[in-house]
Amino acid sequence: MAPQLLLCLILTFLWSLPEAESNVFLKSKVANRFLQRTKRSNSLFEEIRPGNIERECIEEKCSKEEAREVFEDNEKTETFWNVYVDGDQCSSNPCHYRGTCKDGIGSYTCTCLPNYEGKNCEKVLYQSCRVDNGNCWHFCKRVQSETQCSCAESYRLGVDGHSCVAEGDFSCGRNIKARNKREASLPDFVQSQKATLLKKSDNPSPDIRIVNGMDCKLGECPWQAVLINEKGEVFCGGTILSPIHVLTAAHCINQTKSVSVIVGEIDISRKETRRLLSVDKIYVHTKFVPPNYYYVHQNFDRVAYDYDIAIIRMKTPIQFSENVVPACLPTADFANEVLMKQDSGIVSGFGRIRFKEPTSNTLKVITVPYVDRHTCMLSSDFRITQNMFCAGYDTLPQDACQGDSGGPHITAYRDTHFITGIISWGEGCARKGKYGVYTKVSRFIPWIKKIMSLK
């Protein structure tokens, strides 16, 4: 009987196993549905917390509505959502001519500046020389309804019709040893200073005009020329314009019995290494008003140093090199409308580093901001004529001084350096409320070209 009972129990157990399995193990579809991770709903604490873009849309995938709840601003939401969905379509800067790019989903939109159109603002509707210089690297002029670019001497127009390509190693205005990290300028906080009108001096006395400048390294001011008198002393500066022409101030010419020229030097104390170049002829502008004489203008303004410009013709050509390169001569329009609307120009020379102190043995250079004409005129007790302009600082002790006269005022544009002024005069050196006064080269372009064309 016992064996029969045991057998019945075993059979009953085996018969119940399939039913037990079905109760313990779920079917695959049901199990997968059960194990899927569902999005966690915010707890009551999270619901009352301010929206957080990282929690809502980065840690978890969010909807546009959730993003809007975070930003609480439709425009900001659209900007974020366009990038969030498929990346930033504007990252490659697709808009030409300084157009503004707005990202979209799978696309972008360019907002073009005036006179430009097209998906990427690539089409020029109406070019003007007054808008970004007509996109010209050097000179721009209007021909019918289009702009036409041209280049300074020793450059050729690039195939794009805008750029200028140097035709030689020593083309004008090329600063071959240009400063890289050590810019020929003053710190940003200095350059940002605006010219401020201060009270006029009660004792005006026009004085030949670098105070507190930096050393100009070899080849960094390659257009600088130095005028030497019969005693071997520096008395003025100049600017190389061509192998046989040096531009200077007219008032420099009557200061000595003879004139020699030195180029390519940054330290004139080493007399044994410097080479004096002989002068063939000097051309002084016939309307020049000398410093020892001034006339009373019809408006009763005292005028001196007007037409302060002269050109020296060399007996033998100047040999160009990395350290000796001429400055480029601009057109009048380019100088007035482009160069003189830049923030600043560069002035260099061997003049006195302090008022009534000895001249410097080393070449100095400073960056001087342009001063608007109204401020310039009100700052001086002497008349600022149309042939002059002001540059410098109203409070900082940075200026040209005695011995710098005749030297270059250079303005750079697209890595080419153009002559824009001649150091002429000032009321003292680096005086508070006073600026350096320069001969405005753009007023004399025809005269300069005429003299340079003489045989």
Swiss-Prot record:
InterPro entries attached to this UniProt entry: Coagulation_fac-like_Gla_dom, EGF-like_Ca-bd_dom, EGF-like_dom, EGF-type_Asp/Asn_hydroxyl_site, EGF_Ca-bd_CS, GLA-like_dom_SF, GLA_domain, Pept_S1A_FX
Known catalytic reactions: Selective cleavage of Arg-|-Thr and then Arg-|-Ile bonds in prothrombin to form thrombin
Cysteine disulfide partners in this protein: C57-C62, C90-C101, C95-C110, C112-C121, C129-C140, C136-C149, C151-C164, C172-C328, C216-C221, C236-C252, C376-C390, C401-C429
PTM annotation, UniProt: Gamma-carboxyglutamate residues are formed by vitamin K dependent carboxylation. These residues are essential for the binding of calcium.
Active site: H251, D308, S405
Tissue: Expressed by the venom gland.
GO cellular component, one term: extracellular space
Entry keyword Electron transport: no
GO MF entry, a single one: calcium ion binding
The EC number(s) this enzyme carries: 3.4.21.6
Pfam families tied to this protein: EGF (PF00008), FXa_inhibition (PF14670), Gla (PF00594), Trypsin (PF00089)
Superkingdom of the source species: Eukaryota
Top EC class for this record: hydrolase
Keywords: Blood coagulation cascade activating toxin, Calcium, Cleavage on pair of basic residues, Disulfide bond, EGF-like domain, Gamma-carboxyglutamic acid, Glycoprotein, Hemostasis impairing toxin, Hydrolase, Protease, Prothrombin activator, Repeat, Secreted, Signal, Toxin
Protein location: Secreted
List of residues that carry 4-carboxyglutamate: E46, E47, E54, E56, E59, E60, E65, E66, E69, E72, E75
Signal peptide: 1-20
GO biological process: blood coagulation; induction of blood coagulation in another organism; proteolysis; venom-mediated blood coagulation
Domain Peptidase S1: 210-453
Residue ranges annotated for the EGF-like domain, each copy included: 86-122, 129-164
Residues bearing glycans: S92, N254
Domain Gla: 41-86
PROSITE patterns xrefs: ASX_HYDROXYL, EGF_1, EGF_3, EGF_CA, GLA_1, GLA_2, TRYPSIN_DOM, TRYPSIN_HIS
Oligomer and partners: Heterodimer of a light chain and a heavy chain; disulfide-linked.
Family statement drawn from the similarity comment of this UniProt entry: Belongs to the peptidase S1 family. Snake venom subfamily.
The protein's name: Venom prothrombin activator notecarin-D1
